[in-house]
Amino acid sequence: MKFRPLHDRVVVKRIDAEEKTAGGIIIPDTVKEKPSQGEVIAVGPGGRDESGKLIPIDVRVGDRVLFGKWSGTEVKIDTQELLIMKESDIMGVLADVSSKKKAA
């Protein structure tokens, strides 16, 4: 099924958190928090200002974004767990996700 969000909505797929810390400690599922990072799957056309002019969305499909712990509404589409949120719930876009930082 193809899903097209409306207005300033964004569909995000959560990216799983790391299974262990930088020091090598394995994090059990019982204490793991939901990841607040995800990949943008679909975006709406944008919101409208007071005059009715379309304001385009800043994020694009494929962007890796950070969002608040309680942001969005969880939905299941084609067996995939996804989040639908407003663009304003997104805190920022991760610029370079290919390089990993080393622990200090």
From Swiss-Prot:
Its main location: cytoplasm. This is Co-chaperonin GroES 2. Heptamer of 7 subunits arranged in a ring. Interacts with the chaperonin GroEL. Induction: Not induced by heat shock. It is found in: Cytoplasm. It comes from the Bacteria. Keywords: Chaperone, Cytoplasm. HAMAP family: CH10. Together with the chaperonin GroEL, plays an essential role in assisting protein folding. The GroEL-GroES system forms a nano-cage that allows encapsulation of the non-native substrate proteins and provides a physical environment optimized to promote and accelerate protein folding. GroES binds to the apical surface of the GroEL ring, thereby capping the opening of the GroEL channel. The gene is groES2. GO terms for biological process: chaperone cofactor-dependent protein refolding. GO terms for molecular function: ATP binding; metal ion binding; protein folding chaperone; protein-folding chaperone binding; unfolded protein binding. One of its GO terms (cellular component) is cytoplasm.
